[in-house]
Amino acid sequence: DGSRAAAGDHMIALGSSGPHSNGYSLIRKVMEKSKPSSNQLDSLIEPTKIYVKSILSLINELPVNAISHITGGGLLENLPRVLPSHLAAKIDPTSWELPEIFQWLQAEGNIDITEMYRVLNCGVGMVVVVPEAKSQLTIDHLNICGEKAWLIGEVVKSNGKQILI
């Protein structure tokens, strides 16, 4: 429920396999204007990544204060849902490169990055919130489980906004 999250906690991203069945109204609009390559089509129909084995393994080994599945609503709507109202998610957009399919969608659809973060997962399928002291152990554990994991941000005291990018 996220009630254990605290300012200073680290946010660890798990890479997505593609859009994960979200944002397809927007994706269809882009595809009406621009024809995707066969590789891009493959990315668009890649099955949604399932994280259950990795997450169960993680929570059995290390403390996890909150978990956010980045579905419809993207980072902007999903991260605030798992944090108490006095906290905010501070995301570092330079911590990862948008996967190619999301770069193509943004360029061909002329989509503002804020809209991308609101509608699509932008390559981030899940975020786990962990104590700062366990951040690197969490990343290492998830990588051993076969995930692409990285530090995407931290939990901070809210200044009235629940997400800062």
Predicted regions, residues:
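Phosphate/diphosphate-binding glycine-rich loops and adjacent basic-rich segments that engage nucleotide
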Residues: D1-K35, Q162-I163
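Glycine-/charge-enriched secondary-structure boundary and capping motifs
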Residues: K33-I165
